[in-house]
Regions:
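Terminal substrate-recognition subdomain of acyl/acetyltransferases
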Residues: 1, 111, 116-174
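A conserved beta-strand-loop-helix scaffold within acyl/acetyltransferase catalytic domains
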Residues: 1-89, 136, 168-174
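Glutamate identity and glutamate-enriched acidic tracts
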Residues: 10, 25, 46, 54, ...
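Phenylalanine-focused residue identity feature
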Residues: 15, 23, 36-37, 93, ...
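Generic signal for short, ordered secondary-structure residues
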Residues: 16-19, 83, 99-100, 143, ...
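A generic secondary-structure signal for well-formed alpha-helical elements
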Residues: 19-30, 67, 104, 108, ...
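Acyl-donor binding region in acyl/amide transferases
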Residues: 72-140
Length: 174
């Protein structure tokens, strides 16, 4: 794992190649461009951790974590982006979950967020939690419609998270 200034321009280029390749394989252009990552490296470089996977000495996959509160007791690592040049069983989980969790343990980061979506993460003991986001919608009627929907969705999502929590693979002491 590389952190902050340890991540070279060549590493960023490799990451973007992996990231773009993964989107291309799903028939989509990447939603973030190379310039976005170049700016993040320049302006917020200390907040990133790059995990590389290699096969026979060649890099084949990368994941990129965002770290908030670095060095503090409330630091959080967020699994954010990933990509691969080759396909191997469990490569995604190794690169995006197992290695980042190991990095967190080694660096005293108490919390790892594996990213939004994906009930498949539960089998890896990444349990669902609510997340928040902020958006500004310029059109008043559209903003109201979205607000109404989100209010209804909130109840359904809370119930769904509760149902998923009941199926945790972790042992409970209650």
């Amino acid at each position: 794992a590389l952190h902050g200034t340890q991540i070279t321009p060549e590493d960023w280029a490799l990451f973007y190649r992996c990231y773009a390749q993964t989107y291309a394989e799903h028939g989509n252009p990447p939603y973030l461009n190379r310039d976005f990552f170049a700016r993040m490296a320049k302006d917020m470089g200390e907040h990133w951790v790059l995990i590389r996977a290699e096969r026979s000495g060649r890099p084949i996959a990368c994941s990129l974590l965002a770290v908030q509160g670095w060095g503090g007791s409330d630091a959080v690592a967020y699994g954010r982006y990933w990509g691969s040049l080759e396909h191997h069983d469990s490569l995604h989980f190794e690169t995006c979950y197992y290695q980042p969790i190991e990095w967190c343990l080694q660096h005293g980061v108490q919390r790892f967020e594996g990213g939004a979506q994906g009930e498949h993460k539960m089998s890896r003991a990444l349990l669902p939690v609510g997340t928040a986001s902020a958006h500004w919608i310029a059109h008043p009627a559209f903003a109201q419609a979205i607000g109404d929907f989100l209010q209804r969705e909130r109840q359904g999502m809370a119930q769904y998270v509760e149902e998923l929590q009941e199926r945790t693979p972790l042992r409970r002491n209650d």
